[in-house]
């Protein structure tokens, strides 16, 4: 149930390290989450204005405080080197890595900190 949940989507471009949002799977994801009542914030280091969604995006990575879930939707290099446990601080959202951007070490550190990390397409339970 997404009703009233705060969800942060990281990456809205259609592929890694570009600012082109045409045909991005993130658009479908964000629209679906919003239809289901979620409050979605999106961030992409290569996109300042998301034309297809008619919205501006923050210039800096938003704080994770108050976020119920974080979705990695584009594997930008900025996200690959992000110290996720440090960035999250005391926050403990669910993390969904849809693009295999988190390293095994990062996944393990998050889980050790009590953060639920889920992945798509890995097949190894990490």
Where would I find each of the regions flagged by the language model?
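Structural/interface elements that position substrates and couple domains in central-metabolism enzymes
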Residues: 1-126
């Amino acid at each position: 149930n997404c009703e009233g949940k705060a969800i942060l989507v990281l990456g809205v471009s259609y592929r890694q390290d570009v600012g082109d949002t045409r045909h991005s799977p993130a658009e479908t994801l964000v629209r679906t989450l919003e239809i289901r009542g979620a409050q979605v914030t999106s961030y992409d280091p290569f996109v300042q204005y998301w034309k297809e969604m008619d919205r501006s995006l923050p210039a800096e990575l938003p704080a994770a405080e108050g976020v119920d879930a974080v979705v990695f939707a584009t594997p930008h290099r900025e996200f690959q080197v992000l110290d996720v446990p440090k960035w999250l601080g005391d926050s403990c959202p669910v993390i969904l890595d849809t693009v295999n951007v988190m390293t095994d070490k990062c996944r393990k550190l998050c889980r050790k900190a009590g953060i639920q990390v889920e992945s798509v397409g890995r097949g190894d339970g990490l």
